[in-house]
Amino acid sequence: MDALALMSASNPAWSAWPAPAKLNLFLQIVGRRADGYHLLQTVFRLLDWGDTVHVRLRTDGQIQRIGASLPGVAEDDDLMVRAARALQIHAGTALGAELRVDKRIPAGGGFGGGSSDAATVLVALNALWGLGLPVDTLAELGLRLGADVPVFVRGHNAWAEGVGEKLTPISLPQAAYVLVDPGIHVPTPVLFQSQELTRDAAPAKIADFASGSLLDNAFEPVLRRREPAIEAVFQALSRIGTPRLTGSGSGCFVEFATRAAAEQAMAHLPGNLRAWVVEGAAHSPLLDALDAIQV
């Protein structure tokens, strides 16, 4: 189905595109570039749970957000809008789009919501506008928006290095997770300024992660000392397994072999926690949506 067909008077409908959340199964800082950006090593795990981005095409070149994806975020600052405009400028297309999002991923939790929404817009509009740009180009555009955007564009679980943009696809075993959002947001630049943060970890290899020896997150000790609410979540989760931090926080998770085990464990958590049971994905559901529209 081409873009003109989707924009016809007989088919003015919105199309829905998944924007999955992610976990960082470990994260360490191994150095710093000359420009001040920190060098990381991490593993991105994509989930079967996340936001849904809705797209409706326009012929007048306008990019508009319908509703607010996040309270207090102006349209021009919204990563979805910025992604659409960046793609539009790069491709030189006269087509436009309306964008809205059903949010499930909590903001500021390290689950990648804003980055995933932006990546989904890039992938969806590349298809709907009929641009045919390669995924490498979309990933490069995404990197200008945020270091986590490329992994969502590519849609595969990955070992990541650099500032998070050097990606090596990896296979991960099926797993389920109990996620908890403590509801605390500490800006990442503030955490990078902490004197307690370890910035010179010894570089690891994928084999080290595969052996199970890499589980720590460099931001965890900083956040647990800084934020009592995060420490309280770790204490609660420690009763059902080994809690970990995702991204630069504040989201926490515990891994289980099966969804049933995760659901059973979550039943033992305090009822006031904002928690979910989700499963890891072998690849992004966004890739499945892309395949469906290209049939």
Curated annotation (Swiss-Prot):
<feature type="active site">
    <location>
        <position position="148"/>
    </location>
</feature>
<keyword id="KW-0808">Transferase</keyword>
<dbReference type="InterPro" id="IPR036554">
    <property type="entry name" value="GHMP_kinase_C_sf"/>
</dbReference>
<dbReference type="GO" id="GO:0005524">
    <property type="term" value="F:ATP binding"/>
</dbReference>
<dbReference type="InterPro" id="IPR004424">
    <property type="entry name" value="IspE"/>
</dbReference>
<dbReference type="GO" id="GO:0016114">
    <property type="term" value="P:terpenoid biosynthetic process"/>
</dbReference>
<dbReference type="GO" id="GO:0019288">
    <property type="term" value="P:isopentenyl diphosphate biosynthetic process, methylerythritol 4-phosphate pathway"/>
</dbReference>
<keyword id="KW-0418">Kinase</keyword>
<dbReference type="InterPro" id="IPR020568">
    <property type="entry name" value="Ribosomal_Su5_D2-typ_SF"/>
</dbReference>
<dbReference type="InterPro" id="IPR014721">
    <property type="entry name" value="Ribsml_uS5_D2-typ_fold_subgr"/>
</dbReference>
<keyword id="KW-0547">Nucleotide-binding</keyword>
<comment type="similarity">
    <text>Belongs to the GHMP kinase family. IspE subfamily.</text>
</comment>
<dbReference type="InterPro" id="IPR013750">
    <property type="entry name" value="GHMP_kinase_C_dom"/>
</dbReference>
<keyword id="KW-0067">ATP-binding</keyword>
<keyword id="KW-0414">Isoprene biosynthesis</keyword>
<feature type="active site">
    <location>
        <position position="22"/>
    </location>
</feature>
<comment type="pathway">
    <text>Isoprenoid biosynthesis; isopentenyl diphosphate biosynthesis via DXP pathway; isopentenyl diphosphate from 1-deoxy-D-xylulose 5-phosphate: step 3/6.</text>
</comment>
<dbReference type="Pfam" id="PF08544">
    <property type="entry name" value="GHMP_kinases_C"/>
</dbReference>
<dbReference type="GO" id="GO:0050515">
    <property type="term" value="F:4-(cytidine 5'-diphospho)-2-C-methyl-D-erythritol kinase activity"/>
</dbReference>
<feature type="binding site">
    <location>
        <begin position="106"/>
        <end position="116"/>
    </location>
    <ligand>
        <name>ATP</name>
    </ligand>
</feature>
<dbReference type="Pfam" id="PF00288">
    <property type="entry name" value="GHMP_kinases_N"/>
</dbReference>
<dbReference type="InterPro" id="IPR006204">
    <property type="entry name" value="GHMP_kinase_N_dom"/>
</dbReference>
<comment type="function">
    <text>Catalyzes the phosphorylation of the position 2 hydroxy group of 4-diphosphocytidyl-2C-methyl-D-erythritol.</text>
</comment>
<protein>
    <recommendedName>
        <fullName>4-diphosphocytidyl-2-C-methyl-D-erythritol kinase</fullName>
        <ecNumber>2.7.1.148</ecNumber>
    </recommendedName>
</protein>
